[in-house]
């Protein structure tokens, strides 16, 4: 089982490294999202640069990158902590994709996929919090920064063995949003 765990962490990282924003931009003749708009290879920037259709495809692809490795690990009866670490590897792949010179997105949709596979009520909480914050503030980064940590108390209560990997995942997402935090504090953050 140890070998299978390491195989799945590697698989999760490599799957996470597939950047749907970059691939869909190339296939549709659009500019690289890392060099346009907000500079982020994610669904929100794709919405700004390429419209709803490609943004939805990016969102679904990124979500599946987090969900698929968790479903495989669950099918193999790996414990929830192992599944959580496998999910962290999928998000690390999204943040630092080996196929795209380690320049990726911020990991929010991939993390949502991980949560969906690990503990669906936590994913539902994150999605509702994200949508509500986006509706009230029209700021995607603030929505991510609020929604992601909100899942931790629920996980601590219901799935405590997933708390450590999901705390690491949360810290990674907050770290990737550090520029957005600076812009939020300075009143310069982009709105929808």
From Swiss-Prot:
The pathway noted for it is:
Lipid metabolism; phospholipid metabolism
As for subcellular location, the record says: Cell inner membrane
GO (cellular component) term, any one: plasma membrane
| Catalysed reactions listed for this entry | an acyl phosphate + sn-glycerol 3-phosphate = a 1-acyl-sn-glycero-3-phosphate + phosphate
Q: Which GO terms describe its biological process?
A: phospholipid biosynthetic process
Membrane topology category: Multi-pass membrane protein
Alphabetic keyword roster: Cell inner membrane, Cell membrane, Lipid biosynthesis, Lipid metabolism, Membrane, Phospholipid biosynthesis, Phospholipid metabolism, Transferase, Transmembrane, Transmembrane helix
What top-tier enzyme class does this entry carry? transferase
What Pfam families has UniProt attached to this entry? G3P_acyltransf
Its EC number(s): 2.3.1.275
Membrane-spanning regions, if any?
4-24, 54-74, 80-100, 112-132, 154-174
The answer to whether the entry has keyword Transmembrane helix is yes
* One of the record's GO molecular function terms: acyl-phosphate glycerol-3-phosphate acyltransferase activity
Q: How does this protein assemble?
A: Probably interacts with PlsX.
**Function comment:** Catalyzes the transfer of an acyl group from acyl-phosphate (acyl-PO(4)) to glycerol-3-phosphate (G3P) to form lysophosphatidic acid (LPA). This enzyme utilizes acyl-phosphate as fatty acyl donor, but not acyl-CoA or acyl-ACP.
Q: Which family does it belong to?
A: Belongs to the PlsY family.
Q: What is this protein called?
A: Glycerol-3-phosphate acyltransferase
Query: What's the encoding gene here?
Result: plsY
